[in-house]
């Protein structure tokens, strides 16, 4: 017999597929779909940079930091051939009203701006009571599967849902949003665009992007022009709106969620991203090695060593998410400081497995989400 959760439901009852008729009632606008088709690789490559900003209160007190990076990567799923894509990583951490909190987003985005896989981790560390939420989105065949794990104190809740990818044209995930906003800012869009999105509870809804025009902002000691975009996720419960302003090349200058007491601001002017001419590949001359022993043996040893190092470096370049995952894990490890590190690591990385079978008792999570995502 399957274990029941606090509401008397078995795990199987929490794994549900969205009804096609409900999902098909929502769609992205034709203008939004045309925009996605118009984005080329050359334009995307101009958005490969890192933003580093500070989170400040209304009174100007620095509360934490926020960073977003986009870099080239490779993605492979279910033994298929590797696909070139972009790795988007966003992380925010800080202390608001004396409460440590943070959000991490890791996503693989295709050249067509489709989400191949995404992991979102949010936490709030209250005194004697911690809240933790992990959400995974991954493509499995013709389905987009969403796995959510919510931990509140000692209580754990899991749920899984899926959507047919044929009904998700124009879907923009949180990771894809961070890349698309840079493109919209570079183009200085003139008209609103409507896409599909998921809200904080994993519900399918629409999201809109509307231009706010240009205004002046002080960054460091300079007064610069920035272009604003307002993004709204039209959740079935309560819509959420963010206002973001960008430099001419897509660097994020400021970001605020309407109703939030904190603002994310850029404190120093970055180097603007412009098209560059390709530099010729460097030619490295092999330096002669003076061996005192068997030359052939040492030569074979060094050749093999170089081959292994090159192979390892190539793998890390193709999979920059390795460093991202380890960095996020170390940050969370130092925050929690568990006694059993091995068990903690096993539990931390378990949700990243798309093949894991949920086997924990279910508890209710139908109350309002305590998380406040500041990474949109």
UniProtKB/Swiss-Prot annotation:
Endpoints of the signal sequence: none
Location relative to the cell: Nucleus; Cytoplasm; Cell membrane; Cytoplasm, Cytoskeleton
Gene3D superfamilies recorded: cAMP-dependent protein kinase regulatory subunit, dimerization-anchoring domain
GO biological process: actin filament polymerization; cilium organization
Sequence segments annotated as region (Disordered): 355-376
SUPFAM superfamilies linked to this entry: Dimerization-anchoring domain of cAMP-dependent PK regulatory subunit
Domain of life: Eukaryota
Keywords: Cell membrane, Cilium biogenesis/degradation, Cytoplasm, Cytoskeleton, Membrane, Nucleus
InterPro entries for the chain: CATIP_N, DD_CATIP
A GO-annotated cellular component: plasma membrane
Main location group: nucleus
Function noted in UniProt: Plays a role in primary ciliogenesis by modulating actin polymerization.
Similarity comment: family membership: Belongs to the CATIP family.
Protein name listed in UniProt: Ciliogenesis-associated TTC17-interacting protein
Annotated organism of origin: Xenopus laevis
